[in-house]
Amino acid sequence: MPYELYYWDGIQGRGEFIRLALEEAGAAYVDITRETGSGRGTSAMMRILKGADTSDTPFAPPFLKDGELLVSHVANILFYLGPKLGLVPENEGLRYAANGLQLTVTDFVCEVHDTHHPIATELYYEDQKEAAKARSTSFIEHRIPKYLGYFERNLANNPDGDRHSVGNGLSYVDLSLFQVIEGLRYAFPRATQLFARQYPLLVALHDRIRDRPNIARYLASPRRIPFNESGIFRHYPELDQDAA
């Protein structure tokens, strides 16, 4: 039975971190809101979100169904899928380390979102443009170096080598870092132009993942929705600036 992924149609968003893991593993899955028919489409997702409030009712997408089991939140979903897809070490301690790194990615992605919506999510970008400029300047000058510097050091200090974030094999954390680099380059092309020099291990990891057969096929397929100004990583030229 294929996994069922529930996320908003038309954007990569947070659902993309799940898709990359499923695509890399060659797992069978259905992107529910992109399908039509019974039990498909955005209406099917909303029925779950607006259904009876139980202990497993998600607050928001993405969420994943595996048979009768429902799992929500990106890091939680990947913590569940990792062992099943072979995208996390067998060592229990390293699995928790991977989860900690993924939760840090989650924190970073929230800060990315706040560059274009620093005041309120219910307001349009145009209604908070000046605040977004100030937030983006701080993000580029302080938050990108803080987060990417951390992930770069994590690679450098991995006792199993600097090709992977955790252990000696590909993990869902590596795939998520690929997505982070892709998204930052789209949103802030000027600010990221020196990434190869500033974060060589992260960029090398990104490039290796980009060239993996399953990922390369996915990126070239219509399943990979292009970045756009409705998602998390948005390109507004007025928010970008040259790298320091």
Where are these regions (language model features)?
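GST-like fold's C-terminal all-alpha helical module
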Residues: 93, 97-211, 244
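C-terminal anion-handling pockets and recognition modules
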Residues: 216-217, 221
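A generic, residue-level signal for flexible/boundary positions that often mark functional hotspots
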Residues: 28, 58, 65, 81, ...
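Acidic/histidine-enriched, glycine/proline-rich intrinsically disordered or flexible terminal extensions
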Residues: 222-244
